[in-house]
A protein has these predicted regions:
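A cross-kingdom C-terminal cell-surface attachment/processing module
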Residues: 226-245
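Short, threonine-centered small-residue motifs that mark membrane-proximal processing/anchoring sites
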Residues: 212-230
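Cleavable N-terminal signal peptides
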Residues: 9-10, 20
């Protein structure tokens, strides 16, 4: 039996025995290939310290997914569905994959690290909060979908109020965005949701909703030569004398 089959079989046994599977780990130095198959995590966390190659396969019903330092998640042309946190402290190869961030479990999901996705979708009917790390950029090269509802907008926030996180939909990418609130998350690539309004966010949404960053350049004062400074001084002295003269006449 392969390592993946043994791992999945053990998970099934635990579920059938009435025990929740908290986490499935791919150890360091282990390499797993789905080869078009499906890994159903049944709400468990996935910890990747070795290598997981999805290929055209499917990773589904994950809670948290964590790529540890030294770990590799090669998404290939497959799909990954998760409802919890996303941590990328190792390597993520997006390929032409789709990563779906969905409702379930916690009311918020926290990102760690900076990831480049090919296609990513964030959808929530519960107003879920997605928290992105301050100072880091999540990049989307092909397509970005962000969908809340009219009743409860999905929320994009940074992990620290008043400090910005960044998202970058590259120029060739497409977007489908509706009912999203943004707080301290800047769009540094394509302007995002330019015809929408901030649905429940606190602001600092540069690059969203038609709010563009405006660069204000400092204009240095012109430098004067010594002769120019002398003339300026004489002019000021003349103005001062004229002012005193007018003041004396008015008092008289």
């Amino acid at each position: 039996m392969s390592f993946l089959k043994a791992l999945s079989f053990a998970a099934v046994l635990l579920v059938c025995a009435g025990h929740a599977v908290a986490q499935i780990t791919i150890p360091a130095a282990s390499a797993i290939q789905l080869a078009g198959g499906k890994l159903n995590l049944n709400g468990a966390d996935l910890q990747i310290s070795g290598t997981l190659s999805v290929g055209p396969g499917l990773v589904t019903n994950a809670n948290n997914i964590s790529i540890a330092a030294g770990g590799l998640l090669d998404a290939g042309s497959g799909a990954i569905n998760l409802s919890g946190n996303w941590s990328d402290l190792g390597s993520f190869i997006a390929g032409t994959s789709l990563v779906n961030f969905i409702d379930g479990g916690s009311a918020q999901a926290i990102f760690a690290g900076a990831t480049t996705f090919y296609t990513a979708s964030f959808s929530s009917t519960t107003g879920k909060n997605y928290l992105f790390p301050v100072g880091l950029t999540q990049t989307f090269t092909n397509s970005l979908t962000i969908l809340g509802t009219a009743a409860q907008g999905i929320q994009f926030r940074s992990t620290a109020a008043g400090q910005a996180a960044f998202v970058n939909l590259q120029p060739s990418g497409t977007q489908n965005i509706n009912f999203v609130g943004v707080s301290n998350v800047h769009a540094t690539g394509q302007p995002l949701a330019p015809t929408q309004t901030n649905d429940g966010g606190t602001g600092d949404a540069v690059g969203w909703f038609g709010l563009l960053a405006v660069a204000v350049a400092a204009v240095p004062a012109p430098l004067l030569s010594p002769f120019g400074l002398l003339l300026l001084g004489l002019l000021l002295m003349g103005l001062a004398r004229k002012f005193r003269s007018l003041s004396t006449r008015c008092l008289a």
